[in-house]
Amino acid sequence: MNADGPVVNVHVLFFAKSRELANTPRSKVDVPTKITASDLLDLLVSRFGLISIRDNLILAHNESYIDNLSDTVLFKEGDELAIIPPLSGG
């Protein structure tokens, strides 16, 4: 994992299939204050058993989508992270 600095506790919200796989609508997780989006995704997939939908997940940090997995994400204590799989239906 490419992470620097201290660790903070963030709130994680799960939607749709990610909620089903994680078996909870919300959780808390410790993350580095500075981490690449790719490493963050790997951490969340591993921690919450989301491997089956890994390639289709969208992450949002404090209600802003993380568009590029090479981006660095900066966290503060109590930040919010949403895990959003693509919605399906008709």
From Swiss-Prot:
Residues found modified as Glycyl adenylate: 90
Pathway named in the protein's UniProt entry: Cofactor biosynthesis; molybdopterin biosynthesis
Superkingdom of origin organism: Eukaryota
One BP term from GO: Mo-molybdopterin cofactor biosynthetic process
The entry's keywords: Cytoplasm, Molybdenum cofactor biosynthesis, Nucleotide-binding, Phosphoprotein
Transcription regulation as UniProt keyword: no
Record PTM 1-thioglycine, positions in chain: 90
InterPro entries tied to this protein: Beta-grasp_dom_sf, MOCS2A, MOCS2A_euk, Mopterin_synth/thiamin_S_b, ThiS/MoaD-like
One CC-aspect GO term: molybdopterin adenylyltransferase complex
Family listed: Belongs to the MoaD family. MOCS2A subfamily.
Function of the protein: Acts as a sulfur carrier required for molybdopterin biosynthesis. Component of the molybdopterin synthase complex that catalyzes the conversion of precursor Z into molybdopterin by mediating the incorporation of 2 sulfur atoms into precursor Z to generate a dithiolene group. In the complex, serves as sulfur donor by being thiocarboxylated (-COSH) at its C-terminus by MOCS3. After interaction with Mocs2B, the sulfur is then transferred to precursor Z to form molybdopterin.
Known partners and oligomeric status: Heterotetramer; composed of 2 small (Mocs2A) and 2 large (Mocs2B) subunits.
UniProt-recorded name of the protein: Molybdopterin synthase sulfur carrier subunit
Species of provenance: Drosophila erecta
Phylogenetic lineage: Eukaryota, Metazoa, Ecdysozoa, Arthropoda, Hexapoda
